[in-house]
């Protein structure tokens, strides 16, 4: 068992909205991702969506409002709530989702990213 260096993990790729798995916890994948620009509107029917900002600012647009997050802040979007993450600058985030859950909530969505593990 070794600690995971999140900054090193994030430095190992450039793609945005393409999470990388850095570990597993009770059937969930722990992921890091970079955000810049707008992601697609989506929801997750069977699971909540957790966003923890490590660096930068993340804006989570909801149909009835906006949540703005800075470093060290997190937000849990409840299952079934439509949302769209966006970032006006490169932002680093940590995500926790069940294994097999697409980042778009729907694997047929063209923006759905494959599950990619980083070597830790």
Task: Say what each PLM segment does.
Residues 42, 60-61, 77, 82-88, ...:
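Short beta-strand His + acidic residue motifs that chelate non-heme Fe in jelly-roll/DSBH
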Residues 27-29, 36-38, 57-59, 66, ...:
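Short, charged/polar surface micro-motifs in flexible loops or helix N-caps
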Residues 26, 54-55, 70-71, 89:
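A cytosolic small-molecule/anion-sensing beta-strand core signal
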Residues 2-10, 23, 88-120:
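Double-stranded beta-helix
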């Amino acid at each position: 068992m070794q600690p995971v260096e999140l900054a090193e993990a994030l430095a190992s790729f450039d793609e945005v909205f393409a999470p990388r798995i850095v570990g597993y916890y009770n059937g969930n994948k722990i992921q890091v991702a970079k955000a810049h620009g707008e992601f697609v509107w989506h929801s997750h029917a069977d699971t909540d969506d957790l966003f923890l900002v490590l660096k930068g600012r993340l804006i989570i647009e909801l149909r009835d409002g906006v949540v703005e997050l800075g470093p060290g802040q997190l937000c849990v979007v409840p299952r079934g709530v439509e949302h769209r993450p966006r970032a006006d600058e490169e932002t680093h985030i940590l995500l926790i989702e069940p294994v097999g859950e697409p980042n778009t909530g729907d694997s047929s969505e063209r923006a759905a990213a494959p599950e990619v593990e980083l070597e830790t």
